[in-house]
Swiss-Prot record:
Zn(2+) binds at residues 902, 905, 922, 925. It comes from Marinobacter nauticus (strain ATCC 700491 / DSM 11845 / VT8). L-isoleucyl-5'-AMP binds at residue 564. Binds 1 zinc ion per subunit. The gene is ileS. NCBIfam families: ileS. It is an enzyme of class 6 (ligase). A motif ('KMSKS' region) lies at residues 605-609. Coiled coil: none annotated. Belongs to the class-I aminoacyl-tRNA synthetase family. IleS type 1 subfamily. One of its GO terms (molecular function) is zinc ion binding. This is Isoleucine--tRNA ligase. It catalyses: tRNA(Ile) + L-isoleucine + ATP = L-isoleucyl-tRNA(Ile) + AMP + diphosphate.
Amino acid sequence: MSDYKHTLNLPETAFPMRGNLAKREPDMLKHWQDLNVYGNLRKQRQGREKFILHDGPPYANGSIHIGHAVNKILKDMIVKSRSFMGYDAPYVPGWDCHGLPIEHKVEQEIGKAGVKVDYKTFRQACRDYATKQIEGQKTDFIRLGVMGEWDKPYLTMDPKVEAGIVRALGKIVAKGHLVRGFKPVYWSVVGQSALAEAEVEYQDKTSTQIDVRFTVVDRDAVLKTFGTSEGEGDVSLVIWTTTPWTIPANQAVSIGADIEYALVQVDVGHGAERMILATDMVQGIMARWGVEDYKVLANAAGSALENQLLHHPVYDKQVPVLLGDHVSLDAGTGAVHTAPDHGMEDFVVGKEYGIGTLNLVKADGTYTDAAGEFAGVHVYKADEPVCAALEREGKLVRSEKFRHSYPHCWRTKTPLIYRATPQWFISMDKLNLRADALEAIKGVRWVPAWGQNRIEAMFEQSPDWCISRQRTWGVPITLFIHKETQELHPNTQELIEKVAQAVETGGIDAWYDIDQNELLGADADQYEKVLDTLDVWFDSGVTHDSVLRVREELGQFPADMYLEGSDQHRGWFQSSLKTSIAMNGVAPYKQVLTHGFTVDAKGYKMSKSLGNVIAPQEVMNELGADILRLWVSATDYSGEMSVSKDILRQTADGYRRIRNTARFLLSNLTGFDPDQHMVAPEDMIALDRWMVDRALQLQNELHEDYGNYAFLRIYQKVYNFCEATLGGFYLDIIKDRQYTTQADSLARRSCQTALYHVAEALVRWIAPILSFTADEIWQHLPGKRGDTVFYETWYEGLTALPEGFELGRDYWREIYAVKEAVNKCLEEVRARGEIKGSLSAEVTLYCEGSLAERLNYLGEELRFVLITSEATVKPVSEAAGVEQTNLEGLLVKVTPATHAKCERCWHHREDVGQNEQYSDLCGRCVTNVEGPGETRAYA
């Protein structure tokens, strides 16, 4: 037996089978950095239409987590895909650098500003801390394969950006949207600062709920309102609250004008008394209290009780009954304890009745001396002493613990309170900001579409935005207010620009160092400098002005896209929209894409206590960044994104299919030079020509999917193309032709031309997702090419089949179905042990009409398509005892091959051994080894 290996075109490539990504990717990163890929791409694309994805800045604190990775990978996939579309798509990453968490970290290291260190030193320490955090995060983002302006990111602590933030404030002031007010705001007693809605998150908390008697002052007048004198004992209006600590600040009780109230005779353990409760809630309240014996004496409308006076349950004072629209029958008693200091609805109803605030709680959460017996007590610890005082006064009806969802600071994770303080607000309604924003929302493309409803609902309910904070590390509110009138300086716009210029060179310290006398001249003594800082959401929210309009490589407003997690509907998307509408009257973005949160395989949130945290750094070090990138693509980002080690292992399996397909393509392009060996479309063998057309069809679909950010569909289509179209059909069929025909024959070069076109297209399709692998493939492709795939646009070498082409798309679609049916039959026979493989079989296909015509069209080459040693087409009338396949109208008979096996091509052919010199070869192989070589027309 001879060895014919040297006569075959065996696959060969230096492209490794194993990705070994964790080791290879860092080398690829260095390669990109050495080439300055991002910088060169910017030069190449200069003058092209821009696509600007504006980066929502992550907070400069801590290591990146899997959510950060999802966000940056999605952005990178979009930016890269737009680059392949021919756009100039720069990406300038940013960081949010000011705010409370950094202050806390620095306080732990060097102590409080103004106590242990001076403010300037403290701010510099904050700047140093943020810089260090940014470097750590930047390293991880780059490791993910994200390309961008990493050497010149935008930082909200950069003096130029800080100056831009100051100027943005000036524009909002100039437009009349800034107001100063004394209102209840979310207040962090830990941070001693106000918080905006976007900085609030809800967590479960154990609280005390209490029912409290407010005894009426004029019992006779109240009984007269109810039209009865029946019953005995005191008459009390009973409230229910989950914040006992606010009772000292109580100034009224609110009821519903249109709610009916019942006068109830009852004994809850303190003797006979009469309670006023919402009629519809009496039964539920009594059940909650465990009281069975009670009697409704009379009923009255809430409106009839307006302005009745009640005894405060703790202090020696009287409080009125008010009518409020916020009173509901969802929970409680139908009467609402009203403390304007500690609730927006309370504040609003109090304002309607001319009731102001008491300011009993200091910034640190302790009561002032005006709170009497509670002076110095912290609100976190006040429930117990307040309940004790109520018990002492005989006003506590019931008290019990319960768990509920409660607002917490999203940075410090500590419970918040509502506290009335003088603050600066952007008014939502003074100049129709709310209405204008709701109108602008309609003109934005929201991906997914439900994002529009979500942000609309938030804007409809959004209170005035409190933008002031009482912090050290933040952009200052650079305003001067008159000491007596509290009005802004008449030259505020001119002053803001002067301050902005100073900040541009000296950073935010310039505001504190500025000479007020020099700036204000003769007015200096009449004005005081505002010492509040801006909400960090304002910092990031105005980057459409301080970064997008200012950075030369961006220079476009509005941005084409904002992309963040779904929590940013109430965060960055909202703050950006509010400021942009206030400044420009238009939305700052044309499209907004949101992605869901990452959860484990069971849908649980990631937490160290559950042990289900997937750290991106670990994934990159074990599996490689491309596996993480592929997982992002293969997951529906519109909802929660499940990730676990098992899920990532499954992703790695999908990766291997794509990599192995690429390796097959590359290994079969050995000896192929596209400049010399490329076959023109009209000269290609029919199957090859169809393959190129199929790739073009898919490329058109993928272009559309990339345009619609449908990354899951892209992954599925590319995977199926590799698995089914290539692996299960085309590559299977062409192996014989590729390996056995003469090296420079049309049969082989046509096949290599198709493989080359497919490889050129595939490497670009996957590059936005599998960036490292794509560039590795790129370096192993034959022919002259640029240094990296990322300089390219979509491949333009794919050609469509001409109209009316006989062996067109429908033809090969039917052949594909036939091959699937035949494969099923072959597998059944192989499983019975009658054949070893498809080449040790002969098949007879029984069919009629057009199907028979189509199969016969291939003639002798039908066996190459079916990968059998013989394939014959016969009429159905001859199919006695042959079973129908799953393809209607086709019956298949499989029999073991009876002829000798060719040692070169492994086909069993009757002409094996007819040539004395090559006694173990079939005639076709003899022709290919020594003769002119075989010719193929179809497959």
